[in-house]
Amino acid sequence: MPIRHLSETIINQIAAGEVIERPASVIKELVENAIDAGATRIEVVTGGGGKTLLRVTDNGSGIPVDELPLAVSRHCTSKLSDDVHDIRALGFRGEALPSIGSVAKLTLKSRPQDADSGFEVSVSGGHLDGPRPSALNRGTIAEVRDLFFATPARLKFMKTDRAEASAITDVVKRIAIAFPHVRFSLAGTDRTPLELAATGSGAEATLERINQVLGKEFGENALAIDAERDGVRLAGFVGIPSHNRGNALHQFAYVNGRPVRDKQLFGALRGAYADVMARDRHPVAVLFLTLDPAFVDVNVHPAKADVRFRDPGLVRGLIVGAIKQALAQSGIRPATSGADAMLQAFRAEGFQPPSPSFTSRPSSAGYASGSWHPAVSSPRTEWSPQTAHPAHRPLDLGAAPSFQESDQATLATVNVLAADARATRDEAPVELQQKPLGAARAQIHANYIVSQTEDSLVIVDQHAAHERLVYEALKNALHSRPISGQMLLIPEIVDLPEEDAERLATHAETLARFGLGIEQFGPGAIAVRETPAMLGEMNVQQLIRDLSDEIAEHDTSEGLKAMLNHVAATMACHGSVRSGRRLKPEEMNALLREMEATPGSGTCNHGRPTYIELKLTDIERLFGRR
């Protein structure tokens, strides 16, 4: 076949294949055109998942009648001069409308703000008709019917109407977040119509718009971000670590107001949460990057979804640093979703709040419905760290006075009605209840600390909490000096696969910075001669195996700093107070105070929450008091 020129229709259809992938792509292009025209009200109507009808109505500046044919012609635009690097509009190629008209039936109606009447043009399968008079209010109406009728093969790749409608909703929401001063409406998606009222401009207006899109729960768990470095400004809101999702659909990134799905930006976001969130969870964030258009290339993808920065390292460093700083400064702040989940668990099917009046029945357990008659408690015994089981020895969080500890039976049958000296002694000081995590009141199942604040009840996972404290202590110690080690009287020999042993031995110098002295002991074994002094006793065999797995996973993919963090996290897990270990009240309170003073203590190294707070008002609702 000889070389020849393609027809204009075929050229536009090829271009449409790059720009118009699905109905949501059409909505994106039309809504961006409306915003570029200065619209403050945009209405979107769809039908058949966008396959049969797409209509966007705006109150923007409009298109003069003599420019309507140009608007649907390829490479005709009012948004771009001769400088292709100074792009300030959302659209600029002049490809969207002609691409849509080549594969669908497009009708474009417009009436400029200073015109007495409107006109319209139609494009069907690439063939232009008009302009002709049309009755409409000031602004523009772009209507698309029978998408891909000219290229029916494309219809085979469309998803269900519900899936396409969901994609359209997502596009409208993503654009709406960046323009809170614009009123958006969306109808025809077989769901409740979307109505987003204009909220104005500024940070508060943006947060209000975000709450409209993501719900108020995000606003209750969000941290404000505002940082600038070398002419690049980062603003927006990010969720606290315990407020997360199972997918990345609630992550929004904008570059100079343009919604993007750039892997580099979302990778930096993920890096900022690396040691405070589980690997299978995703942060919720809305980030706005503002920089000189000359320092970013938005013309690297047909749909303008990806961008390329002149200095990607600067952008990544700004994102990671700003978010980490915000997380560190957030202090003690539990996710409201944690309390909601707890309430839902209490409200499981079959649960009924207790009635104020009912008949008491004696119980063999020593209490009755409506009243409590505790069984006789066991005598109190003197507690001694020297005589306690190793798993129950006190946590070393500073010197604490000795005290009398009741055994498990006594704890289970405490007489809450007795006004004796014991109750007076156990009463938490008022000043402790004023602390963010309150005063420790009890330890249940030798794993969870229950504390009381002025207006809430807090439940702390002692292992997860101490794991975070040890992890942060290890990281801080590494910045100042190598961690001191404690020599083992008899070296511990750990058998490993030969490849794992060799890999671990190559990192002996790195591990020595943590006070862990190892050396290869034959082809498939590691000799451990020294362990970190600050971690105390630990299961050396399991620690070495876990470190081997951690290094194998991250050895080639991450730098030294990231590697050190992973090693510190693994050591912290082995060096923290274990579940099943009983703590003294002084130790529990010391743990709470350390949590309040430690950044990121709301989650452990694996991203699990370290505590949950239940407000008194929520408890009262459970018991029918509210």
Curated annotation (Swiss-Prot):
Tree of life domain: Bacteria
GO terms of molecular function: ATP binding; ATP hydrolysis activity; ATP-dependent DNA damage sensor activity; mismatched DNA binding
Any one of the GO BP annotations: mismatch repair
Alphabetical list of SMART domains matching this protein: DNA_mis_repair (SM01340), MutL_C (SM00853)
Entry-linked SUPFAM superfamilies: ATPase domain of HSP90 chaperone/DNA topoisomerase II/histidine kinase, DNA mismatch repair protein MutL, Ribosomal protein S5 domain 2-like
PROSITE patterns, A to Z: DNA_MISMATCH_REPAIR_1
InterPro entries: DNA_mismatch_repair_CS, DNA_mismatch_repair_MutL, DNA_mismatch_S5_2-like, HATPase_C_sf, MutL/Mlh/PMS, MutL/Mlh/Pms-like, MutL_C, MutL_C_dimsub
Gene3D superfamilies: 3.30.230.10, Histidine kinase-like ATPase, C-terminal domain, MutL, C-terminal domain, dimerisation subdomain, MutL, C-terminal domain, regulatory subdomain
Keyword terms of this UniProt record: DNA damage, DNA repair
Record's compositionally biased regions (Polar residues): 378-387
Pfam family, one: HATPase_c_3
GO CC annotations, alphabetized: mismatch repair complex
Region (Disordered): 352-399
Family annotation (NCBIfam families): mutl, PRK00095.2-4
Described purpose of this protein according to its UniProt entry: This protein is involved in the repair of mismatches in DNA. It is required for dam-dependent methyl-directed DNA mismatch repair. May act as a 'molecular matchmaker', a protein that promotes the formation of a stable complex between two or more DNA-binding proteins in an ATP-dependent manner without itself being part of a final effector complex.
Protein family per UniProt: Belongs to the DNA mismatch repair MutL/HexB family.
Protein name according to UniProt: DNA mismatch repair protein MutL
